[in-house]
């Protein structure tokens, strides 16, 4: 969200040491645990002759993460000319998505991830949220110390968005319906009707892709990746 990791390998080094994720105290601790599995350590050296190091571990994770692509969503198929890939209601949702300027920030191959934008462009999100501000709420400012970057966050990509809840950097929205309503209000200054929310949400569901030829669902996504 704040752009602190400059490369995918840098990102891979974060969760192992995060106290609320994997909670290791250091990479020395991680390396010692991995070396205790002699079979794994031996297999690792067939790819990385100098063995288990922080650089090699994060490089390996980076290479795995690069395989986690999910092409061939219904929207992809529609863009390639298959008019039957999405319904008229979903297409209306796409038109609303563009009408209310969602596509201005959620652009590119992943419908996001290209820029840092203010959270609460048209209305003060943090005041309305009613929670005490945290360091994480500073967003990009944490890294740049530039006042213009306070509350500015990387725009998330929208592929597979139905499976990536809870939403926002603070995880305060658990449904896509609520996230769509809020983003229209806080970023575009628009109060959507229930029908408009439903149609935009229908469009967003067309962005769910396939992994190894299987459509991602809440029930199968972990199994498919674990079996990679």
Please describe what each predicted stretch is.
Residues 1-228:
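Periplasmic c-type cytochrome electron-transfer domains
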């Amino acid at each position: 969200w704040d752009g602190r990791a400059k490369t995918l390998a840098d990102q891979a080094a974060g969760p192992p040491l995060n106290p609320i994720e994997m909670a290791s105290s250091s990479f020395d601790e991680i390396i010692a645990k991995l070396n205790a599995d002699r079979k794994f350590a031996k297999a690792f050296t067939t790819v990385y002759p100098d063995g288990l190091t922080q650089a090699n571990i994060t490089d390996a994770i980076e290479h795995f993460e690069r395989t986690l692509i999910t092409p061939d969503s219904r929207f992809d198929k529609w863009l390639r000319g298959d008019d039957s890939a999405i319904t008229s209601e979903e297409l209306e949702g796409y038109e609303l998505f563009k009408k209310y300027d969602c596509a201005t920030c959620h652009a590119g191959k992943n419908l996001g991830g290209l820029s840092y934008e203010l959270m609460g462009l048209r209305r003060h999100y943090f005041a309305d949220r009613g929670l005490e501000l945290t360091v994480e709420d500073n967003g990009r400012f944490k890294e740049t110390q530039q006042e213009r970057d306070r509350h500015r966050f990387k725009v998330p990509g929208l592929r597979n968005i139905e499976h990536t809840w809870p939403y926002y950097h603070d995880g305060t929205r658990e449904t896509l319906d609520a996230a769509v309503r809020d983003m229209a209000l806080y970023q575009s200054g628009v109060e959507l009707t229930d029908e408009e929310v439903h149609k935009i949400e229908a469009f967003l569901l067309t962005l769910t892709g396939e992994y190894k030829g299987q459509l991602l669902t809440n029930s199968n996504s972990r199994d498919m990746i674990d079996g990679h």
